[in-house]
Amino acid sequence: MRIIGILLCALPAIAQQYELVLKGGHVIDPKNNVNAVRDVAINGSRVAAVAPDIPAAQARKVINVQGLYVTPGIVDIHAHVWAGTRPGTTNGGQSSFYPDHLSFRTGVTTMVDPGSSGWRDFPDFRRTIIDRARTRVLAMLNIAGVGILAYELEQNVHDLNPEVTAKLAREHKDVVVGIKSAHWWAPNFISVQKAVEAGKLADVPVMVDFGYFLKERPYQTMVTDVLRPGDMSTHCFRWPAPLVDGSGKPAEFLLQARKRGVKFDVGHGGGSFHFRLAEPLTKAGFYPDSISTDMHTQSMNAAMQDMPTTMSKFLAMGMPLVEVIRASTTNPATQVKRPELGQIADGAEADIAVFRLEKGNFSYLDVIGGRIEGPERLVTEMTLRAGRIVFDYNGRSGVPWRTGDLKYPEK
C-alpha cells in the first residue's frame, strides 16, 4: 500500500514533464526540415520535444500559438552594439545601440557586431556589453585595431595587424566569430587581404564591407579571387555593385563566387540596400545567404527599421517564407560557425521567435526612397531566450488578473 501511495503522489510530476509547451503553431525549422504544425516543449533553457500533439496535461504552462509561425530565434549577423567607453571614440559614440533595447521585440536572440571594435578596444566591448547583455552577442574583430573609431583611421595600414587580431580572436573564441574589413578607400585590397590573413590564423570567416567601388580593385576580383569559401560579402545589394547583367539576370561572376562558397549578406543599413539590385536578383532566385540589418541608430529610424521589416521586404520580392527564415536563422548561424544556433530541436537551446504573418497592403522602402508593395508582413508576437519569455506582444503568456493565481509582493 505504501508503494502504491508513493506512485500515486508521483503521478502529477510524471504527467507534467514539461515546464512550457507552445501549442498549435506552424514550426519552420529549415535546419531540421520541419515546416508543419507542431507543438514545442521546453524544460529549463532547452527544447525538450517537438511533436505533432503534446498533451496539454503534460505541461505546467501551455501557450496557444495556433495560427502563428514558430521559428528559431533570429540571428542578425550585422548589428552595431558597441558604444565604447569613451564618449565619441567609437562607432557607438554616435550610432550604436544597446542590444537588449531592440533585439527581443523583433524576434532576435543573437546579434553579431561586425567590427565596431578592434584588437585595441575589444576587451572593453566584452566587459561592458557582451558579458552583460541578455541578448547573445558575438563579435567580429575589425582588422583595424581602433575598430570603427573613424573611417579615416581605418585607412592606417600600420594598424592592420593580422597576428595581434588573430591572437585576440583565439583568446576569445567563445564570442569572437570572425574578422571584419570595412570602409577601405585605397585602390588596392590591403585591408581585405590583412583580414583574410587574420581569418586564416584564427580559423574564422571574414566579412567585408567593400566600401567604395574603384576600378583599380574590382568587386568581381574580391569575390572570385580574394575571399575564401565561407567568407562573406556584406551590403550585397548596394548600388552601384555590378551584380546584374544587361538582361537583368545575376552577373556570371556572382554565380561563380557563390559556387566557390563565398556568402552574400544583406547588411541593409542606412545606405546599402537598393531595390534596383535586390528585386531582380531575388526574382531570379539569387537569394541572400543571410538577411541582416546593419542596425544602428540611423538605420533603425529610417528605411531599414528592424529585422522583421527587412525579412518582409524579401517576402514582397518573392522570396518564399521558408527561405526567408533560413536566411535569418540557420544560415547566419552556420556562417559564423555556430551551427548549434538557429534551430528548434530536442536538446537545442530554446531561443525561439513567434511571428504573425499579417495580410494586407504594405509598402517598403530602400535607402534612397524606392518603394515596393507587398501583401504580407511579419510581426513579432513572442520571443524566448534560453527558455525564458523575454517579449510577449499580446500577453499570451499571462492569466486574467481577476481570476488568475497571481503572487503580489508583500507590503
Named regions from a protein language model:
Residues 98-126, 134-151, 172-187, 203-207, ...:
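Divalent metal-dependent hydrolysis catalytic cores, especially in the metallo-beta-lactamase
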Residues 1-7:
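Sec-dependent signal peptide recognition
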Residues 349-403:
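C-terminal cap of metal-dependent C-N hydrolases
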Residues 17-20, 27-73:
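Histidine-rich, glycine-flanked metal-binding segment
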Residues 178-301:
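Active-site core of metal-dependent hydrolases
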Residues 60, 64-131:
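Metal-associated gating/positioning segment near the N- to mid-region
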Residues 276-359:
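His/Asp/Glu-enriched, well-ordered alpha-helical/loop segment
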Residues 10-12:
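N-terminal signal peptide c-region/cleavage motif recognized by signal peptidases
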